[in-house]
Amino acid sequence: MKRRTALFSGAGLSLAAVTVADAQTPAGGAKERVVIQVSTPEQKLWNQALNYLDNLSEIYGPGNVEMELVALGLGIGVLKLESTQGPRIADALKVGVHVSACEVTMRRQRLDRLDMLPGIGYVPAGLGQIIKRQRQGWAYISG
């Protein structure tokens, strides 16, 4: 079977290598699972992370990849109501991306759920969520 390797890198975000079979569907019908961490307010890094989500969805096809974006630290501001990335976050949510805000960061920045974009999820600790996902076998992309 021919295989292709896609290398994701750039602007501080990296993923080792993802091998995709020509069928574009993981073996045995299992879903690929990817968690992306963004801990910076830099718009170009957020754009890159959101582009990665679009690319992964296109590479694997609808329903074949489960994706979670975890925002923590300085990156949490991009999930606030006034964020310029709001429309792209909404688009990601519409295609099934789990967008998670770190509640530790929110408390430290005195933010509550009313300050945040509608439709996002919340995790007690962003780093804890990433560790949990890695233990569950998810691929990890950091930013």
Features from the language model and the residues they span:
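Secreted/extracellular ectodomain signature
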Residues: 21-143
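N-terminal export signals
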Residues: 1-23
